[in-house]
């Protein structure tokens, strides 16, 4: 169940500098850390790795930018990397700053089953605004509710999370 974002987090814990603040490391272990591959070439995470990651070329965003197509991507923190970094072929930087607009809606720091609607309404507010503005030719989003709440194992919370996405999508369709 490998996830590149989790591998980046543990890599930074081992070979990040003193500014690392994701959790209290107590002390930095004196080890030579190497990941299986480099999870983020732009940010050089990790600094040492065993195999070269594949180069992903001609992503959809890259092609859209070549053709001057304006795009908009939005999600909350839990899935922001999926509509940006992973979508762009494991690339942190934008292909064209003038054509790409990325919006991260900060996730709440509470267990997902306690707030299963997450930020669906906030995402939808901004998504509908982007649609109605007419400024974008290509728009993508990721509502994380089904995935993140589903992992809690609470069926009732998951149902609420998915229903909140249903309500949000009804608003998007109206836009």
Named regions from a protein language model:
Residues 1-175:
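Feature captures the catalytic ectodomains and active-site-proximal regions of enzymes
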């Amino acid at each position: 169940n490998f996830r590149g974002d989790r591998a980046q987090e543990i890599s930074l814990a081992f070979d990040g500098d003193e500014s690392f603040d994701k959790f209290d490391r107590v002390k930095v272990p004196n080890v030579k850390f190497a990941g299986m591959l480099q999870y983020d070439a732009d940010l050089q995470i990790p600094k040492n790795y065993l195999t070269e990651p594949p180069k992903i070329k001609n992503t959809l965003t890259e092609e859209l930018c070549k053709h001057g197509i304006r795009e908009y991507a939005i999600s909350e923190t839990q899935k922001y990397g999926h509509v940006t970094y992973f979508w762009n072929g494991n690339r942190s930087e934008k292909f064209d700053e003038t054509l790409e607009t990325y919006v991260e809606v900060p996730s709440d720091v509470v267990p997902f089953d306690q707030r299963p609607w997450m930020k669906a309404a906030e995402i939808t507010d901004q998504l509908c605004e982007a649609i109605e503005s007419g400024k974008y030719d290509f728009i993508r989003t990721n509502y994380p509710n089904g995935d993140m709440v589903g992992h809690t194992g609470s069926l009732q919370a998951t149902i609420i999370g998915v229903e909140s996405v249903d309500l949000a999508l009804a608003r998007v369709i109206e836009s």
